[in-house]
Regions:
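N-terminal positive-inside, membrane-proximal cytosolic segments immediately preceding the first
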Residues: 2-38
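Short extracytoplasmic
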Residues: 62-98
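Soluble extracytoplasmic domains of inner/organellar membrane proteins
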Residues: 90, 96, 102-221
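Aromatic-capped interface at the extracytoplasmic side
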Residues: 11, 15, 44-61
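Alpha-helical membrane and juxtamembrane elements of multi-pass inner-membrane transport
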Residues: 15, 19-22, 61, 80, ...
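Short Lys/Arg-rich amphipathic alpha-helical segments
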Residues: 32-35, 50, 74, 107, ...
């Protein structure tokens, strides 16, 4: 039963992740060039620097799109290879963060929780984007839940620094509490998640089901 609880907790949303990635791409895709380079290299050298950074951005975007396409096609090895290229050549950009998230996703699918945790920790600790760090922490909690480290999963899911993930964090905390057989606490966490969730969200049905499941078990004890 505990294993089923953990699997239930994992079903949070590769779709949500994909939507966030695509939203990020739409907003930032062609804007990752050095707009402050003039102050560094001077006006005379700016055109050469601009061409260099634009070429790097275009190259990174090509690899990024390739990685997404491979992932959608289920080509795990190729998606991982593309992610490794981004990590190696573009680590200092948000492409590197997204590549680590992809590596973690693929590793989790294969049950390689150690590598998934390593990739997520890189983003959580080193990303310059708070939203990326918050997402990585959230996913790291879920991977620890799957790996059976409920104490660490609980620690990661318990934070005030949730950014825009106001529903996701209490939901994952509820999943952890459910696996710990703390059913009334899980219900409270799921209720907080539901309160923060947009009324029309596609996640509402699953979240409500988990809340009702925790409540029914607690009532029968």
């Amino acid at each position: 039963m505990a294993e089923n609880d953990k699997l239930l907790g994992l079903h949070v949303a590769e779709d949500d992740d994909a939507q966030r990635v695509r939203a990020w791409w739409k907003k930032n895709g062609m804007g990752i060039v050095a707009g402050v380079a003039i102050g560094v290299v001077g006006v005379g050298g700016f055109k050469g620097w601009q061409a260099y950074t634009e070429n790097r951005a275009l190259s990174a975007s090509d690899v990024f799109q390739e990685m997404l396409a491979y992932d959608e096609a289920g080509a795990i090895d190729q998606a991982r290879d593309s992610a490794q290229v981004l990590v190696k050549d573009y680590r200092a950009t948000s492409y590197g963060d997204l590549a680590y998230l992809m590596i973690a996703k693929l590793a989790t699918k294969e049950g390689d929780f150690s590598n998934a945790m390593e990739a997520l920790t890189q983003v959580m600790q080193k990303s310059k984007d708070p939203a990326m760090s918050q997402l990585a922490r959230l996913r790291l909690s879920q991977v620890n839940l799957l790996a059976g480290d409920l104490v660490r999963a609980h620690e990661l899911a318990t934070t005030d620094d949730v950014g825009g993930f106001k529903s996701e964090y209490p939901e994952v905390l509820g999943d952890v509490l459910l696996a710990q057989h703390k059913y009334s606490d899980a219900v409270e966490a799921y209720d907080r998640a539901l309160e923060a969730l947009a009324p029309a969200s596609s996640s509402r049905a699953l979240l409500t089901s988990k809340r009702n499941y925790a409540r029914s078990i607690g009532n029968n004890q």
